[in-house]
Amino acid sequence: MSDSITNLRSPATTSPFDLTDERAYQCWREWKLSDYPGSAEDLIVSVANPCRLSPAEKHALLSRCQKANAAIYRISTGDFANKELVGSLGRQFGLARLDRNLRADEDSITSLKVVSGPGGTYYIPYTNRPLNWHTDGYYNMPDEQVRGVVLHCVSDAAEGGENVYLDHEIAYLLLRDENPEYLAALMQPDAMTIPANTEAGVEIRPAQSGPVFSVEPRTGSPHMRYTARTRSIAWKDDRNTRMAVGFLTELLAGESEFLIRYRLQPGEGIICNNILHKREAFTDDPAGGRTRLLYRARYYDRIHGTELNTIWSGVRPCSG
């Protein structure tokens, strides 16, 4: 995979995510699909010390995030259970504002593992059951959207636990190619509503309505909030929204060439701009020392250097 991003050039006043600007979109589309990673191996970067990346390591990780909104790092030695490496890695990419979600640890980084008892079996991430397609924090308030994520593997399960990823910009591209009206529907401010979260009769989070796709005003980059769950969501009841959701559901259930499948090994992790992902079911073997534990840090920040306004600069026409 090439580290170059110089093929993407257009006047700064245009946006490929403006549904009325077809030329800017086609220019961005050409760049996006050119040399796009075809497998998880294309996203992997070996690093010696995640707390102090070398310039070459940082560039390799960043270039993958610029193209695919994600990179996988691999550490060969060290203390994989050291939580500080998660925060330190994130800070080197401008990730600082942690989302202290409901089940986060005291340091706002979440230990994802099977939890027994109250709360554990209710929230699927803390079970060994499959976790359907979603972006993190899709239920958050508009000013607390999760834009960056670091997911670090301390130990893997005895069996299963594979993740599948899809770059949300690729999802945008495929939807727009199919029918721009699908995107217009999914960008409506009331396209998707998440019901209130109530525990023991107490509302701990109010209902949240918002778009599936939006464009960050500061960076010009697209953002996505989505869940494939059906019992925790209400879609706007209009034809284009239903058609768009149906197309997206079929895409995620299929075998698209853009789906990235990977089972994180101890010492590996993914840093991303909150791309679409799901998790397969898994089986732990505590007696054999194989218990799945991942650290998850969710940020209100986007990976610095991946902003559209940073990449989409200068004036250079697309080919043709």
Task: Label each region the model flagged.
Residues S63-K67, D143-E144:
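Short, flexible turn/loop "capping" segments at secondary-structure junctions
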Residues F80-L85:
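Short, conserved charged micro-motifs
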Residues A68-T77:
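N-terminal, charged low-complexity regulatory/assembly segments
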Residues S34-Y36, H59-C65:
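Short, flexible, solvent-exposed loop/turn segments with mixed acidic/basic and small polar residues
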Residues G90-D99:
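A short alpha->loop->secondary-structure connector
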Residues T77-D79, A104-E106:
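Short beta-alpha junction loops
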Residues S2-P55, D105-L264, G269-I270, I275-G320:
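Active-site environment of non-heme Fe oxygenases that use a 2-His-1-carboxylate facial triad
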